[in-house]
Amino acid sequence: MATNISTSPKEDVPKEKFHLDILNFSQTSQIQFGLRLQDYKKYRQYCSKRIQRLRSQLRKQYGKKNYVNKIVLNGGETEKQINDVRYLQISLLKTERAWSYAMDLKAQFEKDNDSRIGFHMNRRFGKASRNSTQLYELCKLVADQYTIIEAHAYSSWMASSLSLTKQDFKKALEEINISKTIYEKLSEQGDHSQKELYQKRIEETEPIIRFCLYNLKNEKNTSNKVSQNTLTIIEQSLEELKNQENKKKSSTSSTTTTTATTTIEWKSKSIKVDEKLDEKLKIFNEFKKENENKLPKNINASIDTTSNISPIFNIYDKLVYNLINCETIVKNDLSTLVRVNLKNKSVKSEIEEQSTRILLAYIMYHKMKYLYERNSILITMMQRVLDGEKVDESAIKKKVKKVTWNDLVRLSTHQVKVYTIMSESRDTDSNKEIARDQDAQLILLKSIRLYYIAVCLAKSLKFSETMAVLDRVLTNIQNVRKTNTKNQQILNDTNELESNIKKQRSQIHANSFIQQLSENQDLKNQMSSLSIGGITTASGKSNDLISGLDSFDTSFLTEKKLVQLPPQLQPVQAKPIFFDLAFNSVTFPSLDQRKKGSSTGTPSKGLFGFWGRG
């Protein structure tokens, strides 16, 4: 028994609109397949092969055996036929093939000036314009709003190319202005990579507009603006695009909690940061705000190294640690982009790679900045320890157990690398004054490193190598001054380094002379025979330095005596130390005989003896 099965009509499900990055697709194909070297023939051959490959994938091949009707714009039937985005790609590649053929013929026409080639060129430009218009109409039926707007700008661009070949400059100016206006509006809405792509396209429109205005200078009522009707149509399309994007954002926000993405401005470009990196950057910024006041504002100024300086090193280490986490994320993203570009490079992916590199430069600059400040403080402390000054040794002992000049060489080498990366990643590359200070500071850091190496060589008694290194440091100091830097701190450090080198050179000269005399016996004998005069011993050599001040004698190199102890006894005319005690023990001759002799003589006459009276 037959039963009638009633089939209910299917509900109309809204068909998903196709999306095609027209400008990115065309620009990528042009750069990869010939147009980087202006080889239009190679690009045309690529377009033909790509169209054939797409048709074979869609099983829409045209040939003698199987005849397939071409797609005709007929409303609903067209929507049923176009059930894949590859149909839009075929239409775009047909436009690109006709345009590349026309550009190849244009180059031949400019050389030969053959009218037949010029006629063929106009036909090809006309076909490219018709195919771009067909692409625009197809996008209206089956593509999303973003693709429709891009197709409109692309169609206007091809129409302006056709009008230029026909020397219809007024029509060409109108079409190129429409294309420029659309790309300007799209650059305001897209992300960084799309913005760069549209900006390049806008720059390409400028010479075309100037050429049209030059040829229309004698005509009246020529304006460089889009008509009001066209502008309203463009604005309506862009308003629809904004509404669609807002709907997508609202639908995603209902399911997931989204946070506002931050943008970083570096090297005159603004870059959006993804959520994963944004979290790490927020941690870094919060820690920086909390502890920035504890860091020294000027590392070159006098730092109190005697107090507890360990917390400052901990802050620097934490800042660098947070930036290393950010660096790891960006480097992973960059490696994936590079790997993708090796297989399938596009203009959009190249711009994304460039923006990722700029983002990496931003992170590397701040990381190297904090590393440079931290190492500068550590070098200052180590140098003060070697000079015998008091510092907070607890902070240094965490880094090294015992400070030596080799530690300063290692740190200064690291400082040169850090400052080189920091200067390469700096934001203001165009400022000549900053670039000049960077060059001077880098040469100064290399000079300081060489100075520490010279000190280590001097400690190893390699005096000739030390002198060679110090001569090179002096050459670098002259190069610092040739940069004409006006940074006072760099000039002060240069002068201080030069004074230290002069002191070191005088010590090395003396030590080198002593070493040569002690090692070379012939030279020592020759120098010992020289004498200008002075007090010498019986052997002809002075026994000590004090006794040979007026003579040139090298015997002190082996003896090294400042004064002879005990000294030789010599008669000295001086009062005895204990004269009174010595006087008590001295026996003098008796005076009794002299006393008796005086009593037996003539008696005295008295007061009146002068007149002869007794």
From Swiss-Prot:
Its main location: cytoplasm. InterPro entries: SRP68 (IPR026258), SRP68-RBD (IPR034652), SRP68_N_sf (IPR038253). GO terms for molecular function: 7S RNA binding; endoplasmic reticulum signal peptide binding; signal recognition particle binding. GO terms for biological process: SRP-dependent cotranslational protein targeting to membrane. The keyword Cytoplasm applies. Gene3D superfamilies: Signal recognition particle, SRP68 subunit, RNA-binding domain (1.10.3450.40). CDD domains: SRP68-RBD (cd15481). Keywords: Cytoplasm, Endoplasmic reticulum, Nucleus, Ribonucleoprotein, RNA-binding, Signal recognition particle. Coiled coil: none annotated. Signal peptide: none annotated. It is found in: Cytoplasm; Nucleus, Nucleolus; Endoplasmic reticulum. Belongs to the SRP68 family. Heterodimer with srp72. Srp68-srp72 heterodimer formation is stabilized by the presence of 7SL RNA. Component of a signal recognition particle (SRP) complex that consists of a 7SL RNA molecule and six protein subunits: srp72, srp68, srp54, srp19, srp14 and srp9. Within the SRP complex, interacts (via C-terminus) with srp72 (via N-terminus). Component of the signal recognition particle (SRP) complex, a ribonucleoprotein complex that mediates the cotranslational targeting of secretory and membrane proteins to the endoplasmic reticulum (ER). The SRP complex interacts with the signal sequence in nascent secretory and membrane proteins and directs them to the membrane of the ER. The SRP complex targets the ribosome-nascent chain complex to the SRP receptor (SR), which is anchored in the ER, where SR compaction and GTPase rearrangement drive cotranslational protein translocation into the ER. The N-terminus is required for RNA-binding. This is Signal recognition particle subunit SRP68. The lineage of its organism: Eukaryota, Amoebozoa, Evosea, Eumycetozoa, Dictyostelia.
